[in-house]
Design a protein with these regions (language model features):
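Catalytic cores and adjacent flexible loops of soluble metabolic enzymes
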Residues: 1-244
Length: 244
């Protein structure tokens, strides 16, 4: 078993390069042999991630660095290129039908990009890829299709502002849908126009941006993403129900 530490990536006045480097120094001193840059919401800025990778590699060249970045806001391919050019050793990818959307970039695209950049990367066994693709699609059709929100296959730049990870978008949209019904019933009684899901989604993202610094800028990964999202939802419901 290899001891690995994950640094959860986010953007805030607290989460500077020096902040992350200090944590990396501590966990390496405690025995970590690998560092994973866990960009769970895909909001890590490519240049920042490249600089952090280089800082760790320059000081601890023996440490394996892995990049785990989700595709949701659309920065992941640029981030992969930056971390690889600065010494990253491992990149997390996905295959169809689960790649892209709120998941990871597809391994075919990543390999193509890295080859063009001059990296030596293994060829893909396309027969194995297509077999795994078909098996995964069959499993989704039989079971997971009941649970996967189609919106999870869509990338959205809106995620950059709120910093919420794509993995919780399904539950958040379900919560928002139920809340919308309650809010619109109240608005209807007052003679006010109904709010669309887009109206509420933007208001929720704005509320997340308001709540997040007030709870200490926690990286929005489980369970903190749920805490912040739920506080924002309750605030939004209270605002609309009270009319203030």
């Amino acid at each position: 078993m290899t001891p690995q530490c994950a640094l959860c990536i986010t953007n805030s006045p607290v989460h500077t390069l020096e902040y992350y480097m200090n944590i990396a120094d501590q966990v390496i001193a405690a025995g970590a042999e690998e560092i994973c840059l866990k960009d769970m919401a895909g909001i890590g800025q490519p240049a920042f991630l490249g600089k952090l990778t280089k800082m760790i590699k320059d000081k601890h060249p023996e440490i394996i660095i892995q990049y785990h970045g989700h595709s949701g806001p659309g920065l992941s391919m640029a981030s992969i290129l930056e971390v690889c050019n600065n010494g990253a050793d491992i990149i997390d990818t996905a295959i169809e039908p689960l790649s892209w959307g709120k998941v990871h970039p597809d391994v075919i695209s990543v390999i193509s990009m890295l080859k063009n950049e001059g990296f030596e990367v293994p060829e893909i066994n396309m027969s194995a890829y297509m077999k795994a693709r078909a098996l995964t699609q069959e499993f989704i059709d039989d079971w997971l299709g009941y649970f996967i929100n189609p919106g999870n296959k869509i990338m959205s730049s809106l995620l950059l502002g709120c910093g919420l990870p794509g993995g919780m978008m399904g539950s958040m949209m379900a919560d928002l849908g139920g809340m919308r019904t309650t809010i619109n019933n109240v608005r209807k009684k007052k003679g006010e126009d109904e709010l669309s899901m887009d109206d509420l989604l933007i208001k929720l993202f704005d509320e997340v941006e308001y709540v997040w610094p007030r709870v200490g800028y926690p990286p929005l990964v489980t369970p903190f993403s749920q805490y912040v999202k739920n506080i924002a939802l309750m605030n939004l419901l209270t605002i609309f129900m009270s009319g203030t």
